[in-house]
């Protein structure tokens, strides 16, 4: 089935999703399974970057993931600690894998790393004990450190460092919402959170504990310019606060959290300077 035929079948099935269940067979099930296989192999992805830097979302692939929850029944998933099992609808990406399959895939998966089927992991990625949800895309030579989460359909670029305990938000619903996107060569500091479709552009550095959502103000302290929903290329970002506004009683109100761009660097500086030096002010 061609990509256009897959898209058409999945769109039609999603419009009539109340009639899709574990007993559904034939074209709809085949189309959804084919779409998930394309995602799993990295041959299709939920979001793609155009030459002008704009990202477009393939909504039909998100629909395929959502339909899979209706199509697949709950089942026992073995491999838990102490020979325990899990109970879910989505199997592990590594189900049935042996040495040859791992060598062919070319990435490291440390014990405790969980990747759900339909997530793509590229060559030379290192997965510490972490969680990668379905539909996500993790590109080459990226590190996903311990206790970090890459949410459903999130797009992670090449040579990204996702530090310990980071949360990269996922998105399946609402359909019109875009996924979180971390472009190439970014550094995401420990315990940071990037959610609600925020885009972190190429080479940006987030210090430890930066929290970014769709409405978070990202203020350039040199120019005063404010960004929302996107971190500019090669920006170095730390947690900050905006001053409170006067309340009705005349007192200054509470401050509000924001993120602050403390500097911007070029590609050459970014590649030759340690993260600690970039964050030192």
Curated annotation (Swiss-Prot):
Statement: the UniProt record of this protein carries the keyword Acyltransferase: yes
GO cellular component, one term: cytoplasm
Pfam families linked: Hexapep_2 (PF14602), THDPS_N_2 (PF14805)
Compartments, record wording: Cytoplasm
Catalytically driven reaction(s): (S)-2,3,4,5-tetrahydrodipicolinate + succinyl-CoA + H2O = (S)-2-succinylamino-6-oxoheptanedioate + CoA
Keyword line: Acyltransferase, Amino-acid biosynthesis, Cytoplasm, Diaminopimelate biosynthesis, Lysine biosynthesis, Repeat, Transferase
GO biological process: one example: diaminopimelate biosynthetic process
Pathway listed: Amino-acid biosynthesis; L-lysine biosynthesis via DAP pathway; LL-2,6-diaminopimelate from (S)-tetrahydrodipicolinate (succinylase route): step 1/3
Gene Ontology molecular function: any one: nucleotidyltransferase activity
Residues involved in substrate binding: 108, 145
EC number assigned by the record: 2.3.1.117
Oligomeric and partner information: Homotrimer.
Family: Belongs to the transferase hexapeptide repeat family.
Name recorded for this polypeptide: 2,3,4,5-tetrahydropyridine-2,6-dicarboxylate N-succinyltransferase
Native organism: Bradyrhizobium sp. (strain ORS 278)
Gene: dapD
